[in-house]
Amino acid sequence: MHESSLLKVQSFVENYVNFKSSLPIKVLDVGSMIVQKDSPSFKSIFQDKGTQYIGLDVESGLNVDYVPEDPYSWSEIPDETIDVIVSGQAFEHIPYFWITAAEMSRVLKPSGLLCLIFPSAGAVHRYPFDCWRFYPDSAQALTQYIGLELVEADTEQSGFRKRVRTDWKETLVIARKIAAHDEVTSTRLRSIVASSPTTEFVYHRVDKGPAIAQYEKTVKVSIVVYGLRYSLIPIARKFVKKIIRYDKRKNKIAKNH
């Protein structure tokens, strides 16, 4: 769990989740497994607030309460019974994430809230797959597809003045289920879930072929050109800018005297 994700969900909870309800709030954390023992989880945000926290993942492990028989069909969870759904760093690892999103929409109560966090950049990190990257427009398309209202969507940019890592450039999505789904929407969501492949997704390594090899040969430059482009030329530009700034200051001082 990235520290940035934990802080994003903390902000989501403080700004959107109302804990004054007489009934315990049901929270579903999709992709909840703690892989590294000392890693934090979203559970820490909810555990002291009288909520019913359910950690869902595709296999048993630390911080996992529920492993669905079918990862794309949570038949054990009734329709519209969850108040809040959170998920961080999970969707990029789900081959058919839109089916998972449809199930989220199905189990979410009317006025229920959804908070998703996923990367828009970063190195490949298979667990066991790494299939996708997401942007605010991805959030717009996905929430419309599953019948939710998009409330917030933003992709974090890198910054030197931040105390958390930003190299993943995480996209934060907050959405709301305005009302109970009508029969048309419910039927469509069920059809999305029913479209789940009958066979498990299996990763097969695919190496470079002749097309990629030809492209790389075409765009490759010599070490001399590379050095000029990415080393000497930038240095020269900075040097010229410094000279220009120096001349401007010198002229300004001369005018004042």
Feature names for model-found ranges:
Residues 237-257:
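Low-complexity, charge- and small-residue-enriched intrinsically disordered regions
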Residues 1-21:
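Class I SAM-dependent methyltransferase Rossmann-like catalytic core
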Residues 3, 64, 68, 88-91, ...:
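Short N-terminal micro-motifs specific to bacterial/archaeal maturation
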Residues 15-21, 42-46, 147:
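Alpha-helix termini
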Residues 95-109, 113-240, 244:
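S-adenosyl-L-methionine-dependent methyltransferase catalytic module, highlighting the catalytic core
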Residues 25-125, 135-140:
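Conserved SAM-binding loop
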Residues 16-23, 161-165:
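Intrinsically disordered, low-complexity coil segments
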